[in-house]
Amino acid sequence: MKKHQGVALVSVMIVIAIVAGIGAAVVVDQQYSMRRTANLLHGNQALMHLLALESWGLEVLIDDKKQERVEDSLLEDWARVLPPVSADGGIVSGQILDLQGRFNLNTVFSGQGVNQVAYRTLTCLLERYTEPDADPEQIVSALVDWIDPDQNVHNNRGAEDLDYLSSDPSYRTASRPLASPSEMLLLKGMNHDTYDALLPYITALPMPTSQEQGETLEYMINVNTASEELLNCLGDGTDPVGSALVEEIRASGPFTSREEVLAFIQAFLNIQENFDTSAWPLDVESNYFQISTRAEFGDLIMQMQHVVERGDNDIRVLMRSYGQQW
């Protein structure tokens, strides 16, 4: 009798353990379901607010274009940071950046071939502001090969399909302009440390074209919004022209025309004649901007970068990407 009672007791304990395990699993699964539901709701809220911030940025840029100013500068309303503000139980913030204050990677190569001014400028940025063990000549040559349509290795330092097909995973060169600066991470000789150091100075934008003839035009950097580091790499990269330009903007306000910029540079360098203006791709206007947005709802943080092109009469979103940097 006692033996049967012992077996029954063990059976009851096993059943209780199984029921307790099932109950715990149900509770855990319910908690996960609640968390998933909350994340979905917060994700939808965050996305809607990021798109609302995009609309805010577009309106700010449109209003700026309506002003009777030729130049774009960091003194204007669009350059002000939108601080974190409460919205529907969350926190949102935003900022507009002038992408034409950066070096456009796609200027290194165009249909006319290698742009020596752009080639020299990017090499200078890599030499001065990235890791000591970086190989600027190899990276810039690899960028030329990444964009150009042929399979000829540039300067015997670049890389074409055969160099990347042996990688794991294997891939090929794009043979087109970059769609994002992050494509630089695919280049031979590039690593994350070098890329992170270079990122504040670069962008990847479409090359401007002539509406009448469809020809590629020269990409211009906005002197009023460019960094001192980038400006110092223009020209032959040996004279501190960039520092002088930044000081002049701080002292007298933004430049209002390309002619004014070139006259200042010519006077600073004390060049009386044969001044090569092509070495100074500078202007005072901007057409490309990045609206950086951030939203926090619950435990979820969502960030989006919106690359926009502003024309004389319209504005359009070229790309949206999630993440901190584009």
Spans of model-derived segments:
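Compositionally biased linear targeting/interaction segments
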Residues: K2-W326
